[in-house]
């Protein structure tokens, strides 16, 4: 279950006290259901704050950060505070997780690590692009996986192309990549499963992978916010020569 306040307004619509009461009431309800009706029910509760501390990366002391600190102080460990990585178009890094934890620990020990909602392969700001790659720009190698309570994606409006990111992120979360080659291998493997759900490549899965090689880069405006994802890498020199 998730309660989402994101984009409600600057700083969110509701006060920290109101949200703490809501989250604790819902937690009590979930625990009651688990004890009386549904023994396998999970009581984890995701909560996404209104502004998700985009601009300050959890390093300041403004009202956004103070609100999240109060949520940490007033709720149990079952509440997962959802963030986007210190900015709207964030990535999965140990550095942000540590800043988040330490900022919450200033008010209550121990701190709490974030649940990351990464805006990838989301193409809301680049609707003329399909983001069918860019994994190594988002899913950072040698991450300390214990420092995130979870990682979820914001997919594109196009469901089928989004499966490339879903597959690669699933591989990453199952076993954090030690180097970018592991990420590239996961990306390469994705198309066999997307196309026909086996580990054996086929003519159609190879064709899908070939198309995807050239459908990765975002529009210039989006690339400036997120870091540009390279595409057509294997023919990059030939393209440059042709354009010149």
Predicted regions and their residues:
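Basic (Lys/Arg-enriched) interaction patch that binds polyanionic ligands
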Residues: 4
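Catalytic-core regions of glycoside hydrolase
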Residues: 8-184
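C-terminal functional modules
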Residues: 178-244
């Amino acid at each position: 279950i998730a309660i989402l306040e994101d984009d409600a307004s600057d700083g969110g619509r509701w006060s920290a006290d109101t949200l703490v009461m809501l989250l604790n009431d819902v937690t009590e309800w979930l625990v009651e259901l688990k004890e009386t009706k549904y023994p396998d029910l999970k009581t984890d509760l995701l909560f996404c704050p209104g502004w998700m501390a985009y601009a300050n990366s959890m390093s300041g002391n403004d009202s956004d950060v103070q609100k999240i600190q109060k949520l940490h102080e007033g709720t149990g460990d079952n509440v997962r505070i959802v963030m986007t990585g210190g900015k709207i178009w964030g990535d999965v890094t140990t550095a942000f997780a540590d800043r988040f934890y330490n900022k919450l620990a200033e008010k209550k020990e121990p701190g709490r690590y974030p649940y990351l909602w990464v805006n990838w392969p989301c193409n809301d700001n680049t609707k003329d692009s399909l983001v069918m790659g860019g994994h190594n720009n988002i899913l950072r190698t040698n991450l300390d996986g214990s420092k995130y309570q979870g990682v979820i994606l914001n997919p594109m409006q196009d469901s089928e192309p989004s499966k490339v990111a879903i597959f690669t992120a699933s591989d990453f979360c199952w076993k954090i990549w030690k180097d970018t080659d592991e990420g590239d291998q996961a990306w390469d493997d994705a198309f066999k499963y997307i196309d026909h759900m086996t580990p054996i490549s086929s003519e159609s899965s190879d064709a899908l992978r070939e198309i995807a090689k050239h459908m990765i880069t975002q529009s210039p405006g989006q690339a400036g916010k997120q870091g540009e994802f390279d595409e057509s890498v294997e023919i990059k020199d030939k393209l440059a020569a042709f354009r010149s």
